């Protein structure tokens, strides 16, 4: 977070040094790009990784989640309209590697807002999720657990 603040400060200083009559976004943007270059050159002196990398990971995460949301919505609609007799609802458990409260909460929210599944309970040690799914056949169960693991990997990548 310090890198973003520093980059914005560099951009504002750039605007001030240009001595223009009024604020121009193009000047601020060019100052921001100059700040990016400076911070990239000096990022080894910061304790965190270069912040643009985390922004890229967050964008990638959003894309993956939107894809999963759309495909699971279509799958749930398909079950409701055409496969009501074939549904096999049930519970399954998932053991997580996440440790921080915010990341566990975020994963819980991602599971809950994905159609066809919801978190019923989290164990006392916050390591195991108990999830209700619209279909717990082997194929669907594996697919759900794979997508949850993928979410978990992306959360770990963002939180590094």
Swiss-Prot record:
Keywords: Antiport, Cell membrane, Ion transport, Membrane, Transmembrane, Transmembrane helix, Transport
Localization: Cell membrane
Pfam families: MNHE
Residue stretches spanning the membrane: 22-42, 55-75, 100-120
Main location class: membrane
Gene Ontology CC: plasma membrane
Record InterPro entries: Cation_antiport_E
Membrane topology qualifier: Multi-pass membrane protein
Protein origin, superkingdom: Bacteria
Gene Ontology molecular-function annotations: antiporter activity; monoatomic cation transmembrane transporter activity
Quaternary structure and partners: May form a heterooligomeric complex that consists of seven subunits: mnhA2, mnhB2, mnhC2, mnhD2, mnhE2, mnhF2 and mnhG2.
PANTHER family: NA(+)/H(+) ANTIPORTER SUBUNIT E1, NA(+)_H(+) ANTIPORTER SUBUNIT E1
Job of this protein: Expression of the mnh2 operon in E.coli is not able to catalyze Na(+)Li(+)/H(+) antiport. It does however confer higher growth rates than the control strain at up to pH 9.5. The operon may encode an NADH-ubiquinone oxidoreductase.
Family: Belongs to the CPA3 antiporters (TC 2.A.63) subunit E family.
Protein name, UniProt field: Putative antiporter subunit mnhE2
